[in-house]
Amino acid sequence: MTSTDTQRDVVELLLEARQVVSLAESLAHQSCTTETRELAQHVSDVVEWVLPLHCADEDESVTSRLTGRNTVVDAALTQMRREHLALDAPMARVRLLCRMVARDVSRLHALRFELEAAATDLRARLERHQTFEESAVIPALKRLLFADELTAIADEMRARRQSLAA
């Protein structure tokens, strides 16, 4: 695998959280069916583990390798950690609403607007966060880390996901 392929793998794994919000937004526009209940359960499950994995990837694998290499990058890493903490409540809100729909799909009618608002809020926060990461953290990964370090990050990220699949 080339260094560019490894960089792409790391970046793609860091950006996978975007897919979660699209699922939550689509859920708000569904009919009350068994498939909708299953989608709500799926979104709840994914929010419960994908976004925390994203934070763990950055906090455990990325930050540990970038800290101390550049003062501007150190400040960006501090901001990134703060943003992760600020995502906890919006994620919990989406997860709770999806669980409520998964338990009783007929509640979707009553929760539709709240779910859409929660998903929209989470999307806006994630987009700001990911825009920041794409402008500050990801370029630092590419600029400051060697190929073997990027490979180690990608391996750690995959291992976190494999432990969930097991």
Give short role names for the model-derived ranges.
Residues 1-166:
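Small-residue-biased structural context
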